[in-house]
Amino acid sequence: MSYTLFTDEATNDSYSVAILIKESTFDKDSIKRHYVNPLPECIDRGSVIAYSLPYNKLAISASYAKLEATKMIKLLDAQKVSYIYVADATYFKAFTGLTKAKPNLGYLLKCGIAGYEHINVVYGISYGSLIHNERNFEDLSLSMFTLASALTNSYSKIGKDLFGDVELNTDNDYSKLHSHPMLAADIETTGLNPFESELWTIAFAWNEHDGKVFDIRGDKTALKEFLTTYKGKLLFHNATFDIKHLVYHLWMKHDLDIEGMLDGLDVFRNKFEDSQGIAFVATNNCNENVLSLKDLAHEFAGNYAVDVKDITKIPFDALLEYNLIDVLATNYVWNKYLPIAIKDNQMDFYENMYKPSIMTIMQMELVGLPMDNDVLNKLSEDFTKYNDDLQKELLSYPEVITTLKSIRKELVDAHNLRLKTVQHPDTHYDHIEFNSASPNHVAKLLYETLGLEVLNRTKTGNPSTDNDTLTLLRARYPDIEVLRCLMDIQSLEKILGTYIPAFLKGTLKADGRKYLHGSYRFGVLSGRLSSVNPNMQAIPSTSKHASRVKECFVAPDNWLLVTADFSSLTI
């Protein structure tokens, strides 16, 4: 562990601040430039010391960091250090006992090691990360502001003074909202899928501190009337989510009500704005954009976003407050990134490409992709049986039998090494079977039992066993039948493990079909849309079993299902 000081004076017996940073970035001039110089002039530079953080390899375990932190805290306490700036996420968690680092950016926290709670900890940003992620400049500034304010006794918790003129759980009187030319809006629902969830609350805010939250678990007629007649702009963050839910619950009479869906979408078509879209065009760069409201508004609202996976299990008053902070934060994000988007000439794209695309995406998500239930069930049954047959075939190969014996023997030997007297017999692990989904088992079969050449390796340096590697091995060793069997099994595993379960969870509608309703997102590194819940863009199209999978998708009654393949569109 190295250390450095920032004055020419002799070493002190005590210091106020200790900057802790990874050994690979432990450079005095860089530390001084990024962490010492930004401190207020009233802070004595002689009261600052920097230490390198012990690393036994490129990435360290939580247990290793905890052990080293326990050693370091004793030294820091002996030097009367009051503030620790930890520019490393793993060590920050070790010093505080917290499970996450990034949400605690900008907070002054107590040390979590017993007996040292009097020492304060600040989560810092390593200056080395600035090279590959320019967004870390803001995070570094926030962390240094936290340290500086703590040292000058001016620290205030992020989000402390958010609320101005606010009303929680107001009645259904939306009339006063008409006077505001723009309202940030946000809903809280019992789930992500509008077809399987309910609306609970909706919040509106006309600036970064003032707003109202409405309980909409009951009658929603007044809300629908307000949204229809409101002449201003409605600002959402991730507009597709909120508008999609509002359209379904307020305008659609049933799951297949296309007319109601179109009427609802028309209400929002010319009156919505999206702070996520503005942030997307304002920050789009070579790094994957971080576009969640909680991340974009962190320096404004702080870590208010406790993971709410089931809103029915939290106090309703807490939900109302959470909903209100969302709309205040939405206004903050809009006000922060709109000037940047305008300065960078991004508004034409936002108005004429992004927003129209959002309307199309919302319609896609509400309509969904229909599936024939009978064909889907038959596909699941056939593929399950086929996989069972392939597994039986695989286990019958002499090479696999030999590999399995070796695996069991190694387990017994390893176990017996830990025993002092009683030894387990060779049959102790006979319950273990060869697992075709285990990279270790397959690698042992391919590269030890069969002695095949290692053509590819994983990121960790182990011999690869993925489908691409099996394809190469099959071409090089066409007479080894066990390779063909493994490839067939792998081609089924993703379908049975990922796609079939997602298909079976589709929304069953009145026409007897199940529908997939994926969610599409901007902001991925490739610049394309991404899809989740389920991933509609990764449905098999060219694999061995793709044609069977495609048979599940059918057109609704009186409709045609048409596909267009723009395979070279990005060129």
Enumerate the language-model features and the residues they cover:
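Acidic beta-strand-to-loop metal/phosphate-binding motif
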Residues: 82-89, 184, 232-242, 561-563
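A short acidic (Asp/Glu
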Residues: 29-31, 94-98, 193-199, 244-249, ...
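Conserved "right-hand" nucleotidyltransferase catalytic core of DNA-directed polymerases
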Residues: 153-214, 218, 256-270, 288, ...
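Active-site flanking residues adjacent to catalytic metal/cofactor-binding acidic residues
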Residues: 20-21, 87, 125, 185, ...
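Anionic group-transfer/hydrolysis microenvironments
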Residues: 23, 54, 88-90, 128, ...
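Metal-dependent phosphoesterase core characteristic of DEDDh/y 3'-5' exonuclease domains
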Residues: 34, 38, 42, 96-131, ...
